[in-house]
Amino acid sequence: ADDAARREQRLAIIKMAQSDRFRGVTRHLLKSFLSPDAMADEALVGRVIAMADAVGRENFVLQQHAILGRQDQSDTLRSLDVPVLVVGGSLDTLTPPERSEEIAALTPASQLLILEGVGHLSTLEAPQAVTDALNGFIAHIRHASG
């Protein structure tokens, strides 16, 4: 769940989106989603903007309201009885590494991977590293289950 400051930021973003400045919201948020190196990659920036455009203003606002209403899931994480891979970026400002560490610590059978120099959109910034981590995680589960 968001803290009070993050909640206020989210409400301001919703207001901006509702004022027909959806692309402006995307450009405004880009630095929250991407690392500085990724921000210099025009093709990647273009892909993220295209993804936001495809979501559309109405769906973006609905997503933000859903996030505002989410409850703390710490108890759910503690109760998980399955292997969990938590992947984060060292430069992720939306889910900072400390939060990824907290999530992993709450989950009994978790592995944590923090990708150095990567922001929030790790699958776009470091697709091979994420794929390798997932493949390794699945292989570990298969090996452990016999």
Model-derived features with residue positions:
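Short beta-strand/loop motif that positions the catalytic acidic residue
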Residues: 80, 86-88, 92
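Catalytic active-site module of serine/aspartate enzymes centered on a nucleophile-bearing elbow/loop
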Residues: 108-146
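Generic recognition of short, well-ordered alpha-helical segments
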Residues: 4-8, 75, 98, 102, ...
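Conserved alpha/beta-hydrolase catalytic His-Asp/Glu region
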Residues: 2-6, 20-79
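Structural signature of beta-strand start/N-cap positions in the alpha/beta core
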Residues: 76, 83-85, 108-111
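Short alpha-helix in the alpha/beta-hydrolase fold that links the catalytic acid
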Residues: 82, 96-105
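Glycosyltransferase donor-binding loop in the core domain
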Residues: 17, 52, 92-95, 119-125
